Amino acid sequence: MSLNHHFRRLAALVGVLLGVSVLLGACSKPTGAGGSQPVILNVGATAEPTGLDPATTTGAGTPFVLLYNVYETLVRINDQGEIKPLLAKSWTVSPDATVYTFDLEPSATFASGSPVDAQAVVDSLLRIRDGKDTTQVLRSQMEKVKEVTAVDEHQVRVTLTGPSQQWLYDMTSTAGIIYDLGAATDLSTTPAGSGPYVFSSHDVGSSVTLKRNENYWGTGPRVDEVNFRYYADANAMVTAMLSGQLDIVSNLTVPQAVDQFSDAARFKVLEGTTDGEVVLGFNHVNPALQDVRVRQAINHAIDRQAIIDGAWGGKGTLIGSMVPPTDRWYEDLSRTYPHDPEKARALLAEAGHAEGLTLRLRVPNLPYAPPIARLVAAQLREVGIEVVTEELEFATWLESVYKQRDYDMTVVAHVEPWDLAAFARSDYYWGYDNPEFTELMAAADATTTEAEHTATLKKAAKVLADDAAADWLFLLPNIIITTTEVSGIAANGTGLSFDLTHVATSR
């Protein structure tokens, strides 16, 4: 989760991965934006923004729509998980890895016409670090920032309290957004950024509309208007795609339906990877779940391949940790706790629960979570754990589970990049506190070489897996369906944004 961040895409993926789709129904001429007829892109999505100010809003729905489209960052992440320039054309790092100097794009402007200058960058970064309404996750990502200084109009220097491998990566996402704070607007209702699109409207419960930024400082977008339309039923999106109402399903959240798009004359199917770890999360405040034997029992009780097959059409990757294969410190830890119901029963008896145990499993009503919850509940009952399941509206889940921590177990996809660090925060909604793991994460962040960073994070991931801090069920695939006219969509979902920068249609 960062969840804020953390729902750093939940989907955006499902949820962040959250099943999404793009409808190009009303597109006319292939001349693109600026032609005689407007090019309109309609995007069907399952995760609606719970707010429009990324600094104060949790959930993946907000960055899914706004990040890189309306708001830009100094640096961005590409579909291969690499950090690339955006508002900063280049940057340097001091030998001790504590001072970052960013050289800004001199031509960059906000949609209002104001320059994206050094002072705008300073004000935006300090807003995240010092803002009283900034989400907890974003504040934690800026904790290491000691000072932000405008060296001159187009250069910014950021001084950290110590070396941090994580910090620059965090700057590719919500924590690194540069806001037009001088705009005469309330950012909670009217986003104001420098991206290729401008915010137009939000019809709560229905849609968000973006329009082409006619004064964009970079290469302009190839569509004139984007309508993100929200579906509570992922199958309804499939039906809409098949009937010609949609032109893109930008993360198929009913993978069983992929065979319905086999007509190569009409559809293209892209299959990539994501950062979306589907986690059976534990509330470590619960006395029973504080016992590692109970957590290990749950891990042994779960048949993860059966969950992939039964809930996700056989699509997905077993991982066994909070590290996706696209991270350089990935190791396959999926056999740490093999499916072994007898071992699970023995561990429960050893922990004093031979007569059984009852736990609440509260999940968001995102496409992947309820079917997974039903399978998890059935498998746990086989070893003597009675599971009381409850499906919640996503906004309710964020308030009750994520903020108030009113749950025993939950299922959610954490889709933000480099999110292993979330387990090092005892104030996070899991309430996990393992000094050995926390020390390893701090040591990894303070390394100054890639090799040291990788080796230390591998150790940390292994400690986390051995401690059964959660049950990492599987990694979500990124399954995208488009019409044959659509181009410019990356197969991998490695960030929180549904990036429209290069999307086009030949229709």
Where are these regions (language model features)?
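Alpha-helical secondary-structure segments
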Residues: 116-126, 153-159, 195-196, 223-225, ...
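Long beta-strand-rich cores associated with HINT superfamily self-processing modules
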Residues: 480-507
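Structural transition elements
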Residues: 313, 317-350, 368-371
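N-terminal lobe/hinge region of extracytoplasmic solute-binding protein
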Residues: 45-95, 126, 192-193
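Surface-exposed binding/hinge segments that line
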Residues: 96, 103, 137-181
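Ligand-site clamp/hinge motif
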Residues: 185, 213-259, 386
